[in-house]
Swiss-Prot record:
One Pfam family matching this protein: NAM
Gene Ontology CC entries for this record: endoplasmic reticulum; nucleus
Note on domains (UniProt): The NAC domain includes a DNA-binding domain and a dimerization domain.
Alphabetically ordered keywords of this record: Cytoplasm, DNA-binding, Nucleus, Transcription, Transcription regulation
Subunit structure: Interacts with PAS1.
Annotated region described as Disordered, given as residue ranges: 167-198
Organism: Arabidopsis thaliana
InterPro entries referenced in this protein's UniProt entry, alphabetically: NAC-dom (IPR003441), NAC_dom_sf (IPR036093)
Lineage: Eukaryota, Viridiplantae, Streptophyta, Embryophyta, Tracheophyta
Name this polypeptide is given: NAC domain-containing protein 89
Cited SUPFAM superfamilies: NAC domain
UniProt biased composition (Polar residues): 167-181
Protein's job: Transcription factor involved in plant cell division.
Keyword Metal-binding found: no
Length: 340
């Protein structure tokens, strides 16, 4: 290693060379160490003790050029001393622009504490390509450290430059959940999650369901469930209707006609009238009343039976699978009319 080229002593150069030869050696000082040791010693003129971090006008270079300027070679982070840029003549912002873009401060300046004592501040900046305010964000990040009580204008700062490899053109940096939203929603409907306690995802689902969109979704689910229940009821009514038609056939043969419409007692102990259309009641009653007198023959009887068929086909609540039984019963009644 050319120690003159990098401007460091032989001891420092030997240490840096060892860090590149032996796996596990890494220069990664903490926030407190950067301020309390490196930055303070730099400001006190103790250059030899901090020569591992070079002086560099960061804003004269693009961020992708900075790794080559670092004394300690690394794949993840690089450190530099730099004078904080002067403010613009008529503004409060520091000059942090390069030829191709600018460093934009994000969030508030935060205190750095050593124990309970505040020893400095830390500010985070993100590099954007282009010019404000339409710059395009990149994956280059810089943390700027300053000693407490020092004038901000032209103050010496130490910078930690990093590249966020997980960042991808402004998209989410986190991998998607292993389970889809449909599976998660099913788990919420069935009860608690596998861990037994509500997760952040469950809380998010609850928050969504509490909103207007969630209420609409729940209403649609309730309607679907209600429709399913109606279909089951229709099958049940169809069975009862089939039994009652058979009973009507027996009543015809014995000469006893029913005077009451059959009823159904629901699970809630409420009495409900079966959904027999009025047209069917009238046509069937007419046939039963006219059958003993045998006044209608031939064409008239055929018309009556035809109207009864039309009425039967108008019953929407009867399951299609039961039509074979109903048609058979009506055919039997028709045969009785013609045989007698």
């Amino acid at each position: 290693m050319d120690t003159k080229a990098v401007g460091v002593s032989k001891d420092t150069a030997a240490s840096m060379e060892a860090s590149t030869v032996f796996p596990g050696f890494k220069f990664s000082p903490t926030d407190v160490e950067l301020i309390s040791y490196y930055l303070k010693r730099k400001m006190d003129g103790l250059e030899r003790s901090v020569e591992v971090i070079p002086d560099l006008e960061i804003y004269n270079f693009e961020p992708w050029d900075l790794p080559d300027k670092s004394i300690v070679k690394s794949d993840s982070e690089w450190f530099f001393f730099c004078a904080r840029g002067k403010k613009y003549p008529h503004g409060s912002q520091n000059r942090r622009a390069t030829k191709m873009g600018y460093w934009k401060a994000t969030g508030k300046e935060r205190d750095v504490k050593s124990g309970s004592e505040v020893i400095g501040t830390k500010r985070t900046l993100v590099f954007h390509i282009g010019r404000a305010p339409k710059g395009e964000r990149t994956d280059w990040i810089m943390h700027e450290y300053c000693v407490k009580g020092v004038s901000l204008d032209d103050a010496m700062v130490v910078c930690r430059v990093r590249r966020n490899k997980e960042y991808n053109s402004g998209t989410s940096q986190k991998a998607p959940k292993p389970n889809s939203s449909a599976e998660k929603h099913a788990k919420v409907q069935n009860g608690a999650t596998s861990s037994g306690s509500p997760s952040d995802w469950d809380n998010l689902v609850d928050f969504y369901l509490a909103g207007e969109s969630g209420e609409k979704l729940l209403a649609e689910m309730a309607e679907s469930s209600e429709n399913l229940q109606v279909d089951n009821d229709e099958d049940f009514f169809a069975d009862i209707l089939r039994d009652e038609i058979i009973n009507l056939d027996e009543a015809v043969m014995t000469g006893n006609t029913p005077n009451e419409v059959p009823t159904l007692e629901s699970a809630s102990m409420e009495i409900r009238v079966l959904p027999l259309p009025n047209m069917i009641d009238k046509q069937m009653s007419s046939l039963l009343e006219e059958r003993p007198s045998q006044k209608k023959k031939g064409k008239d009887a055929t018309e009556s039976l035809s109207s009864c068929f039309v009425g039967l086909y108008s019953i929407k609540s009867v399951n299609k699978a039961r039509w074979d039984v109903i048609i058979g019963v009506v055919a039997l009644i028709a045969m009785l009319f013609y045989l007698e």
